[in-house]
Each structure stands twice: as C-alpha cells, then as structure tokens.
A protein has these predicted regions:
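Contiguous beta-strand/loop segments that form the cofactor/metal-binding neighborhood of enzyme cores
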Residues: 144-212, 225-232, 255, 270-271
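Rossmann-fold dehydrogenase core element
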Residues: 71-90, 107-112
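NAD(P)-binding Rossmann-fold cofactor-contacting core
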Residues: 1-13
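A short glycine-threonine-serine/GTX helix/turn-capping micro-motif
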Residues: 134-141, 211-215, 219, 239
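C-terminal helix-rich "cap/oligomerization" subdomain common to oxidoreductases
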Residues: 13, 26, 33-36, 177, ...
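A short helix->loop->beta-strand "cap" motif at the edges of active sites that frequently abuts
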Residues: 18, 53-55, 80-83, 179-180
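Beta-loop-alpha module in the N-terminal Rossmann-like domain of NAD(P)-dependent dehydrogenases
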Residues: 5, 16-74
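Predominantly a Rossmann-like dinucleotide-binding segment in NAD(P)-dependent oxidoreductases
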Residues: 90-160, 262
Length: 271
C-alpha cells in the first residue's frame, strides 16, 4: 500500500495485511496490478507511472479532471499493453448490468432521465472531508455514474447544455449521436426529503426504469476485480476500460466549461 501519508498507509497495511511503501514507484515495480483511491488529478498522474511499470489499472471515477490528462492515461495503457478498468458501480451490479444489456438491444429509445440527489458532505459522512468533492461538486462526483449508464444506452454524446441550481445542484442536457436527448440532475447537497435516485429511459411506446442495486458496493468491487483478472484472447478489452473513462471525462469537461460561461450566454431571458 502507498499513500500520501505514510502513517495512514502503514496503519492500513497493519490492519489488512501487506506492506506500506514510502516510494510509490517502488510499489509499482513490485506488483502486477494497482487499485486507486486518490483524487482524480493525482490518480491520472500515478496511473501513467503505474502503466509504465507494467501494472494493470483499476481506477476510480472520474479518471481525471481534464481530457488531456485522461488522454495521457489512455495512451500509457495502450503503449504498455496493460489492462484497465474504471469502477462505475452500477456496471458491476448484476441486476443493473443486466438491465443495461437488455435496453442496449433496442434502438428506439428517444430520451433518458437520471436524478441522483445525495448529501455526502455532511458531518459524519466518509466523504465529508473530501476537498475535491467539495470543490468540484456533484457534476464530477456522481455525474460519472449517470453517464456510465446513459451513454451506453443512448449512444455517444455530441454536445451538452448545463445549468446550476441551489447548492451544488447541476442539471445537464445531453444530445446523443442517435438523436436521443437525455437529462441528468445531480446534487451532493440535497435536503433529506429529496434524496434518492431515478433512472428512466423512454421509447416510442413504453418506458423502463433501472432496478435498485441487488448487490453491495463491496460485491460490485469484487466483480470489477474479477473482470480485470479475466484472460481474453488477443487484445484485452472491456466496455468500462480507460477509453470509456476518457469519454466520460470529455462530457464532464464540456459541461463544466459550459457552466463557466457568463449567465447571458447560457440562457435566453423570458420577456
């Protein structure tokens, strides 16, 4: 194990078994695969170094904060010929993954809607002291989860429109290559009465909603690790590899850049 705090890495190693490293490159040289639990900008830098050592990568979402950084990770993975996976939780929950596989069999979905309202920054939350989540907000923290299902269901995203609400709430309209339009509404600061998730796809004659997770996050992570370890003939590939992770970052960055525009360039006043 390695961490920016050697003391905390040592504590974890003593608790779970293993060795704490002071130098991260020494650890990369000794292991076959690496799982990351660091801020996205730190992850992107370390992932490039790990790939250069020949380590397979299990990354958290988002892969990075910029498309350029995500591109560097993808290039490093390709050059080294290592495997890569990004942990989009729902993609490794059996029931939700099965739902996605079923909706992908149809091409008549014309719209989608995801609402993810949480409050993970309150005292007592394991994420309350996460600086990057406080700074970047719901778009970058839970936006990847929404995109991990909307993009494979409705197709690549060509352009976005976004607007801020109360707190860190943000709503993003996604225009897909297929012609479908989807919306994701996200918050990490939702009041108790509005917390929860909604996942919907609408077709010509019906609609469908994603079922609740039937596995725990630990079981989902176990499935992710198993996928990373699965041998494949020829070039190794997975729908949640670093290249998909990079595509998610591109969408998030586009939405973030849209939100940086002055208000008069984001909306048409109603007169």
């Amino acid at each position: 194990m390695w961490g920016r705090s050697l003391a905390r890495a040592t504590e974890m190693a003593e608790t779970f078994g293993g060795r704490a490293y002071e130098d991260v490159d020494d650890m990369f040289a000794d292991v076959d695969a690496v799982a990351f639990a660091v801020p996205p900008d730190v992850q992107a830098e370390l992932a490039v170094r790990a790939a250069a050592h020949g380590c397979h990568l299990l990354m958290d979402k988002p892969v990075a904060f910029t498309t350029e950084a995500a591109d560097r990770v993808a290039a490093a993975v390709d050059q080294a010929g290592v495997r890569s996976l990004v942990f989009f939780t729902s993609r490794y929950c059996a029931g939700q993954a099965q739902w996605l596989a079923e909706v992908q069999q149809r091409a008549d979905w014309n719209s989608g809607y995801v609402r993810k309202y949480a409050s993970i920054l309150e005292p007592g939350s394991p994420y309350a002291d996460s600086p990057w989540r406080r700074e970047r907000g719901a778009l970058w923290d839970i936006g990847p989860h929404a995109l991990s299902m909307l993009v494979p269901a409705l197709g690549p995203v060509t352009h976005v429109i976004a607007e801020r609400g109360l707190g860190d709430t943000v709503t993003v309209v996604l225009h897909h290559e297929s012609g479908a339009v989807s919306t994701m509404s996200l918050s990490l600061t939702a009041p108790p009465g509005s917390r929860g998730d909604t996942w919907l796809l609408f077709g010509q004659d019906d609609h469908t909603s994603m079922p609740d997770a039937n596995t725990t996050s630990v079981e989902a992570m176990t499935a992710c690790i198993s996928a990373l370890l699965t041998e494949q003939p020829g070039r190794w590939h997975h729908p949640c590899d670093v290249h998909f992770g990079r595509d998610v970052v591109k969408i998030l960055q586009a939405a973030d850049e849209f939100l940086q525009r002055p208000p008069e360039r984001r909306a048409q006043p109603v007169r």
